[in-house]
Structure formats: structure tokens, C-alpha cells
């Protein structure tokens, strides 16, 4: 009996000790400091990851302006900010070409049918395998054809979907065009603009921001400008006095000897003076609009020229429709003559300041070889 009592007391002691340990452990765990929360992603400093390679489009032509298929790295000298660069590779790759067609025609000075013919001339002159897209714009841009190599299909789209509009907003169109090049290889991007370059205010994107987007994709821009053609047409429309059709009218038809049966004078003779009918333009508001448009074309011509030359493309200023069509073929040759040259810059891209611009110069090391490239590039802010 005494042993049972002793055994029972021992069990109680063990239970008491166990409970005390459990309470102490719980108290200690409650006094522990809570772990620091993991910083949110937006609080972390973004890591800039750069691919230390520049892809530079260079057009290579012979004396006659034709594509030179024999270009090698020994033929090309590349300078970046005045420092010679070591070329890694030279490739002739299939191009990605977006046609940006101005169909705004408020004053009747741009011919949509002619623009269509120009676009078809460019398309039919491009190398087989070229990826082509088509966008038209007036008050807003409209994508008519996504990327394709089907030339007959694109021609059908041009014949059935191109429609004239009113005023043109080039800045919105340039921004929309830049968006189409996502996922395309750098160095193969081309935009062909057929326009007078006059930008109607009130668009969603300013021209400054549109040009920033254009520079970011580093596309070569080729321009067929309506500016000279439009000004030639304006010369006749802005005159207050316009001559008639050149047909002489009799001032007094009743005195005409032929009409009165007088056989004494020849049929072409008359006893009264004759005159030519003309017209006087009394629409002052329209004349003012035409003058404003003329000034706008001169400003836009300068801007279009800068855009083309900065990107390594060319601007053409035809004086008649036949020139316009012929120059469309020249643009296709320019696109087909372009190579992609790659090099690792001697000054690392990772060391560049955000938005840093680097000047690029190219020179030929071979007689009879002519090279053309963009003037420079903005270091991409890769994240």
C-alpha cells in the first residue's frame, strides 16, 4: 500500500515538471522578435542588364547605287564617338518593312490613288522573303496588313482597303508604327513614309514623343515626300486671277457676219472685239489656308529630312508622279542593300547614363563601295 502511494506521488511530480517546462517554452517562444518582413519588389533597386552588343544597319552599294553582295568586315570602318570599333559580324538578313501611307487630303493636294501605286511599286521591288506590313493614316492610324511575306495578298489589301480621309496626324501614326516592331530583330527594321509630313494638331501623341519612340526602335526611315508636288499645285490655286480655257468669245454675237448671213467677211472674222473668260478667286479664307499649308510643308520638309538622315535612310522630293514612282524603286533598292553589322563597344553600355546618345560614323575601306548608316543611337535602358 505504501509502495502504491509512493508511486502515485512520483507520477504527480513528473506531471508537474512536464507542465512547468511546457509553460516556460511557450513563454520563451512568445518573447521572440518577429522576423523582418521581406522587402516588396517595388522597394528594390532595379538591376540593369545590358547585352554588350550594338547592331548597326549599314547600306552597302556600288557606284551605280546597287546592292553590293560581297561586303566583309575588312571593307568597313566603324567609329563610335570617334573611337574605332572591332566588328564581330556582318550579315545580310531579311528585312521587316512597314509602309506608312498618308491618306489625309483636306485640300485635295495628295492623290490617294498615286499613293497606292507608289506602295505597290515599293512592295513589288523588295526582295522575296521580306516581311511587310501596311498602315494608313489620316486623323488616326489604321493597320491594314500585319506582317506577311505574301506580296499578292498585300496588293489586294491596298486595292480594297485604302480610303481617303481629311487631315493627317503624322505623330500618332509614327508612334503606332513604332509599336509594330516589337519582337523584330534590331537592324532589320524599316519604315517607308509616303506623306507631306504636315501634322494636324490635337493628336494623342506629340511629335516630340513620337520621335522618341521612333529613335528607340532604331529603324531606318525612308521617305517619299509630297511637299514639292503640293507646292507646285498651290502655285496655281493661290492666284487671285485665274486664266480661262483659252477659247475666244465674241463680245456681240448678234453682229457676227456669219450668224447674220453676211458673206463679206471670212467665217473666223468679226466686227466686234473678242475676249477670253477667266475667274477671280474671292474665297479669302481658303487662300489663307493654302498659304498656311505652304508654310507648313516647308517646315515639315526640313523635319522629314532630319528624320531620314538621322536614321540612315533617305528622303525623296519628286516633282512629278513619274519621279515619285521611280523613286519608290530606289527605296526598295536601299532596303535590299542593307547589312546588319555587330560590334562590342569599347566603352561598355552598362557605363552609359540613362538616355545617353552615342555618335556613329562609318567609312568604306574599298574603292567603289559606298556605305550609309544612322548617325548614332540612344543607349537602351534595359532592365
Q: Which residue stretches match the model-derived regions?
A:
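Short amphipathic alpha-helical "recognition" segments used for binding
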Residues: 8-9, 13, 56-57
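Bacterial N-terminal signal peptides
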Residues: 11-22
Amino acid at each position: 500500500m505504501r509502495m502504491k502511494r509512493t508511486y502515485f506521488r512520483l507520477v504527480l511530480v513528473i506531471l508537474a515538471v512536464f507542465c512547468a517546462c511546457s509553460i516556460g517554452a511557450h513563454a520563451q517562444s512568445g518573447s521572440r522578435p518577429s522576423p523582418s518582413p521581406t522587402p516588396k519588389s517595388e522597394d528594390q533597386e532595379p538591376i540593369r542588364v545590358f547585352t554588350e552588343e550594338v547592331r548597326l544597319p549599314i547600306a552597302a552599294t556600288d557606284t551605280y547605287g546597287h546592292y553590293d553582295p560581297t561586303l566583309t568586315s575588312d571593307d568597313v570602318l566603324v567609329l563610335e564617338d570617334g573611337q574605332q570599333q572591332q566588328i564581330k559580324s556582318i550579315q545580310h538578313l531579311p528585312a521587316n518593312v512597314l509602309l506608312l501611307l498618308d491618306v489625309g487630303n483636306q485640300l485635295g493636294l495628295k492623290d490617294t490613288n498615286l499613293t497606292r501605286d507608289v506602295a505597290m511599286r515599293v512592295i513589288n521591288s523588295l526582295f522575296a522573303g521580306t516581311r511587310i506590313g501596311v498602315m494608313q493614316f489620316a486623323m488616326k492610324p489604321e493597320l491594314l496588313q500585319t506582317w506577311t511575306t505574301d506580296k499578292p495578298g498585300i496588293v489586294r489589301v491596298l486595292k480594297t482597303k485604302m480610303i481617303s480621309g481629311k487631315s493627317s496626324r503624322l505623330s500618332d501614326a509614327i508612334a503606332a508604327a513604332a509599336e509594330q516592331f516589337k519582337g523584330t530583330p534590331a537592324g532589320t527594321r524599316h519604315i517607308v513614309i509616303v506623306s507631306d509630313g504636315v501634322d494636324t494638331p490635337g493628336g494623342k501623341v506629340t511629335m516630340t514623343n513620337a520621335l522618341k519612340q521612333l529613335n528607340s526602335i532604331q529603324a531606318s526611315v525612308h521617305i517619299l515626300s509630297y511637299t514639292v508636288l503640293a507646292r507646285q499645285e498651290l502655285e496655281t490655286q493661290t492666284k487671285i486671277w485665274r486664266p480661262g480655257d483659252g477659247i475666244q468669245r465674241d463680245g456681240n454675237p448678234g453682229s457676227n457676219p456669219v450668224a447674220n448671213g453676211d458673206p463679206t467677211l471670212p467665217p473666223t472674222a468679226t466686227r466686234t472685239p473678242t475676249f477670253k473668260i477667266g475667274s477671280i478667286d474671292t474665297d479669302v479664307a481658303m487662300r489663307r489656308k493654302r498659304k498656311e499649308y505652304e508654310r507648313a510643308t516647308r517646315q515639315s520638309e526640313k523635319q522629314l529630312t532630319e528624320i531620314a538622315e538621322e536614321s540612315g535612310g533617305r528622303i525623296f522630293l519628286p516633282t512629278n508622279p513619274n519621279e515619285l514612282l521611280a523613286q519608290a524603286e530606289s527605296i526598295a533598292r536601299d532596303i535590299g542593300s542593307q547589312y546588319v553589322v555587330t560590334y562590342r563597344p569599347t566603352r561598355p553600355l552598362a557605363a552609359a547614363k540613362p538616355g545617353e546618345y552615342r555618335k556613329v560614323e562609318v567609312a568604306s575601306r574599298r574603292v567603289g563601295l559606298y556605305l550609309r548608316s544612322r548617325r548614332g543611337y540612344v543607349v537602351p535602358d534595359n532592365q
